[in-house]
From Swiss-Prot:
It comes from Latilactobacillus sakei subsp. sakei (strain 23K) (Lactobacillus sakei subsp. sakei). The keyword Ribonucleoprotein applies. Part of the 50S ribosomal subunit. This protein binds specifically to 23S rRNA; its binding is stimulated by other ribosomal proteins, e.g. L4, L17, and L20. It is important during the early stages of 50S assembly. It makes multiple contacts with different domains of the 23S rRNA in the assembled 50S subunit and ribosome. The globular domain of the protein is located near the polypeptide exit tunnel on the outside of the subunit, while an extended beta-hairpin is found that lines the wall of the exit tunnel in the center of the 70S ribosome. This is Large ribosomal subunit protein uL22. It comes from the Bacteria. The lineage of its organism: Bacteria, Bacillati, Bacillota, Bacilli, Lactobacillales. The gene is rplV.
Length: 117
């Protein structure tokens, strides 16, 4: 079949973590096999690692369940983090003034597909 789907996607929206910090973790797994990517993420001491592992495992499950792809042949083809909505807060400061605090969020997307033989 020529139009057979060979990739699966998973995403996490509005994760309470800046996209800049998530990108540092995502850059480590792009282009790797899914087993290697999970091994890398489990030993990466960053707050974004557990979230990215969760999205990656979701993409693997989507590939197996929805498209009948073999998990051992999957590769992380695309992985990116875009900025989500920013939560704007204010911190009281001296003399009745206030400073803004931007609590940034991100949208994380991981695409896995089968290796070309």
């Amino acid at each position: 079949m020529a139009d057979q789907i060979t990739s699966a996607t998973a995403s996490a929206m509005s994760v309470r973590m800046p996209a800049r910090k998530v990108r540092m973790v995502i850059d480590l797994i792009r282009g790797k096999s899914v087993a290697e990517a999970i091994a890398i993420l489990e030993f990466t001491p960053r707050a974004a690692s557990p979230v990215v592992i969760k999205v990656l495992k979701s993409a693997i499950a989507n590939a197996e369940h929805n498209y009948d792809l073999d998990a051992e042949n999957l590769v992380v083809t695309k992985a990116y983090a875009n900025e989500g909505p920013t939560l704007k807060r204010f911190r009281p400061r001296a003399k009745g003034s206030a400073s803004p605090i931007n609590k940034r969020t991100s949208h994380i997307t991981v695409v896995v597909s089968e290796k070309e033989a």
